[in-house]
Regions:
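Extreme N-terminus of proteins, especially the signal/transit-peptide cleavage junction
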Residues: 1-6
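Short, charged N-terminal beta->alpha structural module
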Residues: 7-28
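Hydrophobic anchor at the start of a short beta-strand
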Residues: 8, 32, 80
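Short, hydrophobic/aromatic-rich segments at coil-to-beta transitions
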Residues: 144-150
Length: 160
C-alpha cells in the first residue's frame, strides 16, 4: 500500500462497522482513511480520493437534522458507495425519497439480485440472491434520477 496508489475515503456516519469496512478495503491492498461524515468538502478534496464510501449510521436520512455528506462529493467524478444510511442519505441528498419502513430488517437477510453489476464482482451470488447483514428501519422509496435498483430485499425495494 502506498499513498500514491488508489485511496478510498470512508465517511463515517456512526456505523458500528466503519472500522471493519476500512479493514476490508485495506485487506484488498487499497489505502483508506476514515473521516467524520460531515467533514467539509475542502478536506475531502485535499485527500484526493479515488473513491468514497458512505458508512451506515443510526439516524434517519429524511430527518431535517440528520448528518449529511458535503454535496460537492457527488460532482467530484469519483465512484461513491453508500452502505445503509450512506445509501439512504445519498438518495435523499440527490432528490430521492427515504421513509420509515413498516418492517425493520436486522440480521441476515436475502437480497435478490435484479441485474448483473460490477459491484457484485468477486462475490458468490447463488441463484440470483446474496446473504447479507442488514440493520435498518428506513428504506429508499424513490430513487434519484439516473439511479437503478440492482438488488432488493423483502422490506427494501432498493437494497442495492
Amino acid at each position: 500500500m502506498t499513498l500514491d496508489a488508489d485511496k478510498i475515503l470512508i465517511l463515517d456516519f456512526g456505523s458500528q462497522y466503519t472500522q471493519l469496512i476500512a479493514r476490508r478495503v485495506r485487506e484488498a491492498g487499497v489505502y483508506s482513511e476514515i473521516y467524520a461524515g460531515d467533514i467539509d468538502h475542502q478536506s475531502i478534496s485535499d485527500f484526493n480520493p479515488s473513491g468514497i464510501i458512505l458508512s451506515g449510521g443510526p439516524e434517519s436520512a429524511f430527518s431535517d437534522d440528520s448528518p449529511k455528506a458535503a454535496t460537492e462529493i457527488f460532482t467530484m467524478g469519483v465512484p461513491i458507495l453508500g452502505i445503509c444510511y450512506g445509501m439512504q442519505t445519498m438518495a435523499e441528498q440527490l432528490g430521492g425519497h427515504v421513509r420509515s419502513s413498516a418492517h425493520r430488517e436486522f440480521g441476515y437477510a436475502e437480497v435478490s439480485v435484479q441485474t448483473s453489476n460490477r459491484l457484485f464482482s468477486g462475490i458468490e451470488v447463488s441463484e440470483d440472491s446474496l446473504q447479507v447483514w442488514m440493520s435498518h428501519g428506513d428504506r429508499v422509496e424513490a430513487l434519484p434520477e439516473g439511479f437503478a435498483i440492482i438488488g432488493k430485499s423483502d422490506s427494501s425495494p432498493a437494497a442495492a
